[in-house]
A protein has these predicted regions:
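Bacterial N-terminal signal peptides that target proteins for export
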Residues: 1-8
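Bacterial N-terminal signal peptides
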Residues: 9-15
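Sec/Tat signal peptide C-region and signal peptidase I cleavage site
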Residues: 16-22
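Extracytoplasmic "Venus flytrap"
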Residues: 28-45, 64-69
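Residue-level recognition of beta-strand->loop/alpha-helix junctions
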Residues: 31, 62-64, 89, 188
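Extracytoplasmic small-molecule ligand-binding "clamshell" domains
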Residues: 45, 52-53, 59-84, 108-110
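Contiguous mixed-secondary-structure segments that line small-molecule binding/active-site clefts
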Residues: 47-48, 79, 84, 89-189
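Short, hydrophobic alpha-helical packing/hinge segments within bilobed ligand-binding/sensory domains
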Residues: 71-75, 173, 192-193
Length: 193
């Protein structure tokens, strides 16, 4: 199985700890995860940490299940300042190929390996994000890749031959499934399931 790392992008620099903000501030954090997902758990944990550390000065409000938009819409809203934070799915590989590393099959062996890759690549990720108008606040994981379908069990890449499946937007993921002989249809992550 492959571990997918998700990138946490934000348009605003996190200068919230400075005294420049005398008034209360509310920040919106949108994501596409459903209730109970790792998306929700990660975002809720981030909000709890910030809210706890900042007291009444800052409140991070979370909006899951694509309430503020799907992945691409959230990225646009980040640039427009309509959303302060987003936890995108694999859509970041559409922004810059650098982010496609986490869509490549079977190159991440386990969580420790993933952490080493993230640490080694963080400067490249941040540069790619900055070049496209984003700032990475942190990285989050979304578990192991699973392939579900109603045709047959998938235990080898060859088992995908002729299988129609839905996949989140992501250049490399789409290419991978096509190379394995599947017929993937890409769509927003929140529409896949």
């Amino acid at each position: 199985m492959k571990i997918i790392a998700k990138l946490l992008a934000a348009t605003t620099a996190i200068g919230m700890a400075t005294g420049a903000y005398a008034a209360d501030m509310t920040l919106k954090f949108g994501h596409v995860g459903n209730p109970g997902s790792l998306f929700e758990a990660s975002v809720d944990n981030f909000a709890a940490c910030v809210n706890g550390a900042m007291g009444d000065a800052v409140e991070v409000q979370t909006f899951g299940s694509s309430q503020l938009g799907k992945d691409k819409e959230l990225l646009q809203k980040l640039k427009l300042g309509q959303v302060d934070f987003s936890l995108p799915s694999s859509v970041m590989s559409s922004v810059d190929d650098t982010f496609g590393i986490f869509e490549m099959p079977y190159i991440i062996k386990d969580r420790d390996h993933m952490r080493r890759v993230q640490a080694a690549m963080m400067d490249k990720f941040q540069a790619a994000a900055n070049d496209n108008g984003y700032h990475i606040v942190g990285l989050a994981e979304n578990g192991f890749r699973h392939i579900t379908n109603n045709v047959r069990p998938i235990t080898l890449p060859a088992d995908l031959e002729g299988v129609k499946l839905r996949t989140p937007n992501g250049v490399w993921r789409l290419k991978m499934f096509q190379e394995y002989g599947a017929n993937p249809t890409h769509m927003a992550f929140s529409d896949v399931f």
